[in-house]
């Protein structure tokens, strides 16, 4: 039988080489009255993408890829009803989101968690466009000494959102085991090879603020322009020796047996359009965040505290 073709909005840009027609597997979820597609990894080795994908999108051979927010046709590999079980998260990357995905799939009424890592500011754009059910965010505003709310007020004045804490994270400098270069703080970044996070990432915003505090400019840091999209990717750069250090969370350093120099505690929140609070998929997330067993899983990663996990946050209420 012919497969169903539906219009979908892409959550991020998909680059492609002109001259070759490509098929990209996507995870598709229904957000309000539109279908939103998250591009998954490519290549024959990506067995997991087959199980995670709900369809695929064709990139014509004359195109140099497809842009973020573009609406394109997707061929479904599942029934359209299946798309109502996908929870779309767009924003900052955190390892806890993988735990959340795992737990949601194990529920009697499973939901699939489709997460796109575009940084906290990318999450704000997705919320503004109505392209996600929730967004992970950890944007620190030095002016108000508050997280996330100053940015929500500035960029999402017309979107009614509810902010729920996921965890408090330990951010710092990821260094090789034994810290051979004796990196103790931001001042040391002038003498080492650094690996940065992408523009718009909360970690990058924190770094820029710390550099300013130390009286340093981005140009003083060798590798400031080298970017990765996740904490784990930064940690891999340090592990392989491609960089001497990078900013990231303790859990990423611990996962790869690296050392960690703590710099800051930060509040990592889930920002949810209030209209989705009654959605069964979102309610399943909230129930997990309230469960002691899930909080224990978060803390077992290392570098996470859960005193606020599952609680609704209010402006100016840092509570850390």
What are these regions (language model features)?
Residues 1-84:
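Flexible glycine/proline-rich
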Residues 177-185, 216, 275-280:
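Short helix-loop capping/hinge motifs at secondary-structure junctions, enriched
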Residues 105-184:
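N-terminal segment of the mature folded domain
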Residues 115-125, 219-236:
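Short helix-initiation/N-cap motifs at beta->coil->alpha
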Residues 136-154, 235-264:
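A ligand-binding cleft/hinge motif common to bilobed small-molecule-binding domains
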Residues 84-93, 186-206:
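Short loop->beta-strand "edge-of-pocket" segments that line small-molecule binding or catalytic clefts
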Residues 99-109, 186, 203-226:
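Ligand-binding cleft/hinge of the Venus flytrap
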Residues 158-161, 165-170, 258-287, 308-313:
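Periplasmic-binding protein-like
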């Amino acid at each position: 039988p012919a497969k169903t073709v539906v219009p979908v909005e892409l959550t991020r840009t998909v680059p492609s080489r002109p001259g070759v027609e490509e098929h990209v597997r996507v995870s598709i979820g229904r957000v309000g009255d539109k279908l939103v597609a998250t591009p998954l990894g490519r290549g024959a080795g990506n067995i997991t993408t087959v199980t995670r994908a709900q369809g695929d999108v064709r990139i014509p051979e004359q195109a140099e890829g497809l842009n973020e927010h573009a609406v394109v046709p997707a061929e479904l590999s599942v029934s359209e009803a299946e798309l109502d079980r996908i929870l779309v998260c767009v924003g900052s990357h955190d390892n806890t989101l993988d735990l959340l995905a795992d737990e949601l799939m194990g529920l009697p009424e499973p939901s699939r968690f489709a997460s796109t890592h575009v940084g906290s500011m990318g999450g704000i754009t997705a919320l503004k466009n109505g392209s996600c059910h929730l967004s992970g965010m950890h944007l620190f505003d030095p002016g108000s000494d508050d997280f996330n709310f100053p940015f929500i007020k500035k960029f999402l004045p017309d979107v009614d959102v509810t902010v729920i804490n996921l965890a408090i994270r330990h951010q710092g400098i990821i260094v090789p085991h034994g810290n051979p270069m004796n990196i103790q703080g931001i001042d040391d970044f002038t003498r080492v090879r650094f690996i940065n996070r992408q523009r718009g990432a909360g970690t990058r915003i924190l770094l820029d603020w710390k550099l300013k505090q130390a009286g340093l400019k981005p140009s003083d840091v060798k590798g400031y322009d080298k970017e990765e999209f996740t904490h784990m990717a930064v940690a891999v750069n340090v592990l392989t020796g491609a960089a001497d250090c990078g900013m990231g969370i303790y859990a990423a350093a611990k996962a790869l047996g690296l050392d960690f120099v703590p710099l800051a505690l930060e509040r990592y929140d889930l920002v949810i359009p209030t209209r989705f609070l009654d959605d069964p998929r979102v309610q399943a997330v909230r129930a997990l965040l309230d469960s002691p067993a899930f909080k224990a899983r978060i803390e077992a990663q290392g570098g996470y505290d859960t005193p606020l996990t599952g609680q609704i946050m209010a402006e100016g209420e840092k509570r850390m």
